[in-house]
Amino acid sequence: MKTLGRSITIQDKPNAKDLEVKQGVIEFKDVTFAYNSKNVIDNLNLRIRAGEKIGIVGRSGAGKSTLIQLLLHFYQLKQGEILIDGQNIEDVTQDSLRRNIALVTQDTSLLHRSVAENIKYGRPNASDEEMYAAVRKAKAEEFIPQLTDLRGKSGYEAYVGERGVKLSGGQRQRIAIARVFLKDAPILILDEATSALDSEVEAAIQSSLDDLMQDKTVIAIAHRLSTIAQMDRLIVLDEGRIAEQGTHEELIQKNGIYAHLWQRQTGGFLTEQHPIKKKEA
């Protein structure tokens, strides 16, 4: 929410139209973005297929988070264009753009409101039954009934405290995941979604994230490579350019940047991978 709720200086064009997403194809075409006269993203070309799950990998400062901020149209490009289903994001309303993109981040900032209000933040007109269904999918139904606040409210009516301070890190992430399940946007961004959690909690939440990724176009950023190694394709950024791309196995064989990062994190050991579950046709 911190990213989606930030102050935006870019204004809609006078004739901006609502974004219509029927497939979820994302294209970065000759994209260049500069900060302090330095190209952070440098002539980048990337096409993400409808329903494809990709992981963005790279050393600190490679441009991973900048790429996400550009997709959300927080900044103006120096060059190029970003298309969603063939529609330039500069030509659509920002509200419609962000309605079609859901975000789970490392720093889950919740409102100082009730659990229910936080879950319905992305879709305020949702029914309680729809909210309960999202909570079950996020596996948050176990702890919510036990929550209480100083006003004497409990469960879904309990206030979570400023930035969700009354909840554990795992509980905050489950509320955030329930919110995204309820929003049901066709494009999903996971930005270090589990990096702040311990291994046991991370493993439990990863199952919910796998369910969340079904039938969506997904872009995931993670420093912990084992959490994204099962993606359809991994994109390795280096100084704002695509240095490598392929599956985990292909990149290990290339023995390049990705293989070096993997070796450093795992000591060469392969970790068990859990493919993203696909819905049966």
Which residues make up each language-model segment?
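ABC-type nucleotide-binding domain
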Residues: 5, 10-13, 19-281
